[in-house]
Curated annotation (Swiss-Prot):
It comes from Ruthia magnifica subsp. Calyptogena magnifica. Pfam families: Ribosomal_L5, Ribosomal_L5_C. The keyword RNA-binding applies. One of its GO terms (cellular component) is ribosome. Transmembrane segments: none annotated. The lineage of its organism: Bacteria, Pseudomonadati, Pseudomonadota, Gammaproteobacteria, Candidatus Pseudothioglobaceae. This is Large ribosomal subunit protein uL5. GO terms for biological process: translation.
Amino acid sequence: MSRLQEQYKNEILPALQKELDMSNPMQVPKIEKITINMGLGSALGDKKVLQSALKEMSLISGQKPLICNARKSVASFKLREGNPIGCKVTLRKERMYEFLDRLINIAIPRIRDFRGFKATAFDGRGNYNMGITEQITFAEIDFEKVTRILGMDIAITTTAKSDEEAKKLLVMFKFPFKG
């Protein structure tokens, strides 16, 4: 069991249950999954971009990414249906907690001029979305081997009923918000 998973079970769950005044521990919000997505529009012209992104994402997440293909053709973008334009990974259970631990304690402190994430990036249903502009903030990526700086979107899906509950959950995980 990972460090954050034990912390959730032993410290966060009882504290959040008391704070939100819930009788059953199964009602308490928890993180369901983390989805990491890389949109690679530049992969249309250069296939090496897609291969390096797949390799880097597998290093960051610890599992093999899924290649996302274009759903429809768009002539102005020179895009055809079925062309690979991105990759994504969905993390659950053990790998999810390990990734969240590395994200909060290692990757986020390495971001230049970081002042905290916006607390307004919740979607209204208790899920949080954020973007990271450089994949080199993760310690797993070797800076010398990076051919192109790529960003990624990270979606944290929770079982919370509201944004306030989800924010309380993420704050207890020591997630850095502005203000």
